[in-house]
Amino acid sequence: MALKLYPIGIQTFEEIINRKLLYIDKTEYVYRMTHGGGKHFFLSRPRRFGKSLLVSTLQSYFEGKKDLFKGLAIEKLETEWTEYPVLHFDMSGGKHMEKEELERYLGYLLQDEEKKWGIDNPKVGSNNRLIDLINTAYEKSGKQVVVLIDEYDAPMLDVAHEKEQLDALRNTMRNFYSPLKYSEAKLRFVFLTGITKFSQLSIFSELNNITNISMNDEYAGICGITKEEMLAQMSDDIDELAKSQELTREETIAELKENYDGYHFSAKSPDVFNPFSLLNCFATKEFGAYWFSSGTPTYLINMMRKFNVAPANLGKMYAKASSFDAPTENMTAITPLLYQSGYLTIKGYDKFSKLYTLDLPNKEIKVGLFESLLPNYLEGMFAQNGDVAIAQMSVLIRHDDMDGALRLLQTFLGTVPYCNVTNHEGHYQQMLFIIFSLLTGYVVDVEVHTPKGRVDIVMLTHTRLYVIELKLDKNAQAALGQINLKNYAQRFALCGLPITKVGINFDSTTGNVEDWVIEE
């Protein structure tokens, strides 16, 4: 069986087709979008989700390159294959720039397109040059112009919450995009991609008829790989991965789903796999955190700290669309940034209340976020040996040895420098929540309600359920006494598993576990 070639890091449709690399057919979406009543479209998706490839596919389509689409869905749908002049601007190279640098970068982008149309004396100002470029392409070709802008928001993402710098860059980009309104009669199609929506930009404030398809059911699967697409086009890959991992086909599909599936971009969205992680997994035949480790931005972690996001609150939540599918530069909560960046996704929708259920998409995101946040509680030493300690704890708990796991935790915390923020019990609750959540295959929750109070931590393993209560500068027996006094265990009597009660006491002077007591 010939090995399948994966287009990892390749975002050019023509190259993928000519080199016979794997291409997940999205051309039906292309036809649908280009043959409706709209002219201006915007799509928001997380990084490395196939936005650039979609833009490249649109470019090849509008350039009339019919031969590239043989065997794809659009071949049977399109009958004309009209060639249009296409202006393609990739803004991803405009990151980390001051205003003057950004102006020069826009100039370089325009210059590349101007050369194609023989414009030797460009006008001053990027917006004037874009107007001139559209006019020239329209007049010389005799056809309306297609404008494709990839990662329109890239120049502003890193300064989204630095008002002075953001205002300067936003004004520059507003001026650049303004011709998209003034030249409307000369435009056949305008498509912009990005990660987030920035308010007060011309594309949203001036293009009143722009169609935002980011949460449209009809386009929910336009980027990424659905389960149906994976099973139909990557069946052999699944079998090869299963063989390499010594798993059954069903176990392999379940593992892929747990790690990389779980994205939903509308109320009726199909399950969508992260394409970057899925392709890397098939290529390496290893289950790794490919997407998370490829570029989780520092500013995201910093913003989570700024908004005092408790790790335990990163899970299931309810929200209206206006609170997460919203501009991020003036946000008062972290939810829009987490959703639009791909760290939260839609898990459910209630038509009556119009409330969406949001949650972490999958295991890759959950583990990656918690590993990134744990150094906040452990003064940075986690990166050196915390992952090893947690893996060893996971093995011990799998064998029902909570005493051994807590002894190992005590030893590990003894190697961590003293942390100043250790004078409240909630700090330790969040730290233990992260650590227990990183243990392989267990369900962890905090502040679980019972008829007589709230349990600090509840952990469900394959063989038993742990009811855990914490104390600070007291003693473990007091923690266990609270579990028994308030009969917390009764709340879980019907879980079908043995229940183990654990009282843990922390010492604020050392930042470590002082003592613990375990009762079956």
Where are these regions (language model features)?
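Metal-dependent nuclease catalytic cores in nucleic-acid-processing enzymes
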Residues: 176-183, 336-344, 433-437, 482-502
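Phosphate-binding site recognition
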Residues: 1-424, 440
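Domain-level recognition of nuclease-like catalytic cores that cleave nucleotide substrates
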Residues: 491, 495-520
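Mg2+/Mn2+-dependent nuclease catalytic core
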Residues: 166-171, 472-489
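Active-site metal-binding core of divalent-cation-utilizing nuclease and nuclease-like domains
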Residues: 136-141, 435-462
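Conserved catalytic cores of phosphodiester-cleaving nucleases, focusing on short active-site segments
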Residues: 432, 455-472, 486
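Structural motif
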Residues: 146, 464-466, 500
